[in-house]
Amino acid sequence: MHPEWRGQVIADLNFELPALAHGTRARIRSTYEYVDFLEEFLENLPELTQGYPEETRITAPIETWSDDFSIAIAGIPSMVNDFTGGSFMETHYHSQFDNDTYYDEDVYRLHHELFGLLLMAIDRTRVVPLNFAGTFQKAKEALDLDWCARTEADGESLAQALDEAAELAQQVYDRAAAINRGQAPDEDAGRLERQLLNLFQQTQDTFVRIDWYGNVQFPQESLQQSLELLHGAAQLAYFLLQLVQRALYIRPLETGGRRLALELFSPPKARQA
């Protein structure tokens, strides 16, 4: 990895199995911040090679299956042709069964046309088109206010702060989009881009975590999952304790074992000489 790329490179485009048909549609998987730009890009596409029966879609966030995740958390906004759908990854990928039988000419051409046009669209921008509004909204959606209340954490203030951050981020994105469309002065384009790339690194450091299975999540999600598991364990322990108490106290009494039930919970008496 090149540390000097951080703050300079506006996009990393990764290609994984671009000649393999994954599901019924092509998908561009990206960080949350590029989603709005990519969806706008899809709206203005010309007719491309028909590699799939359904239209191309955008999905987020980046997954840990490929190098673009490492590049994203290093501070470079990344995207990849989504390749994790279907059973191929579990049964054929990186094995002797991964051969030219699965080469699809139309899918290959579609991915090259799609990402070639995308590369040119990104290159035409004056300001990196990152929108952090979606990131903050997703962070809010992942916040469990019930657990915040039960642990006396100020979840409401955090949710409000995320709403305000999302609103401000949308205004900044609208400003960048106007510059990129030539509808606003671009004297501060360079400064704005540097600020956005710096913010991208900060959001990656602050909001991106992975769980034991490599799934990407927000920091609070792992804590909330731990609380749920601990709560469930405590409930189970209480339930088992109740069962043990019932077994030791009630059943012996029902069978006439009153003396046995009492002796189980009192120290044995010394034998008389």
Each predicted region: which residue ranges?
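Secretory-pathway/membrane protein signature
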Residues: M1-A273
